[in-house]
Amino acid sequence: MQFKKQLLVIFFAYFLVVNESEAFFGTLFKLGSKLIPGVMKLFSKKKERSLMKRELKNLYDPYQRSVEMERLLKELPLY
């Protein structure tokens, strides 16, 4: 009888420890799965923004516009 009580106590103690650790690591995993993609997006957005700024500078560069205009005018048929 004493042995059964000891096994029961050990089982419940093990169950509580495993259950608590599962909840703890589950919470850590949830937080990690939310934070890691957010951090990755943050760095990728900075790169995208810098590329977009560079493209806008190239778009509004006067020399670049004149080169584009010349290319388009050369494509037009002459009548």
From Swiss-Prot:
Question: In the UniProt record, does the keyword Signal occur?
Answer: yes
- What are the UniProt keywords, alphabetically? Antibiotic, Antimicrobial, Chemotaxis, Cleavage on pair of basic residues, Fungicide, Immunity, Innate immunity, Membrane, Secreted, Signal, Target cell membrane, Target membrane
* Localisation: Secreted; Target cell membrane
Q: Which residues form the propeptide?
A: 50-79
Give the GO cellular component terms, alphabetically: extracellular region; membrane; other organism cell membrane
Q: Span of the secretion signal?
A: 1-23
Cite a single GO BP annotation: defense response to bacterium
What tissue specificity does the UniProt entry give?
Answer: Expressed by the venom gland.
Superkingdom in the source lineage: Eukaryota
Effect the entry attributes to changing V39L: In ToAP2S1; loss of antifungal activity and increase in hemolytic activity against human erythrocytes
What the protein does comes down to: Antimicrobial peptide. Shows antibacterial activity against all M.massiliense bacterial strains tested. Has antifungal activity against Candida spp. and two Cryptococcus neoformans strains with MICs values ranging from 6.25 to 200 uM. Also shows an inhibitory activity on C.albicans biofilms at high concentrations. Exhibits chemotactic activity for monocytes, neutrophils, and eosinophils. Shows low cytotoxic activity and has weak hemolytic activity on human erythrocytes. In vivo, treatment of infected mice with M.massiliense reduces the bacterial load in the liver, lung, and spleen.
Recorded family membership? Belongs to the non-disulfide-bridged peptide (NDBP) superfamily. Medium-length antimicrobial peptide (group 3) family.
Protein name in UniProt:
Antimicrobial peptide ToAP2
Q: What is the lineage of its organism?
A: Eukaryota, Metazoa, Ecdysozoa, Arthropoda, Chelicerata
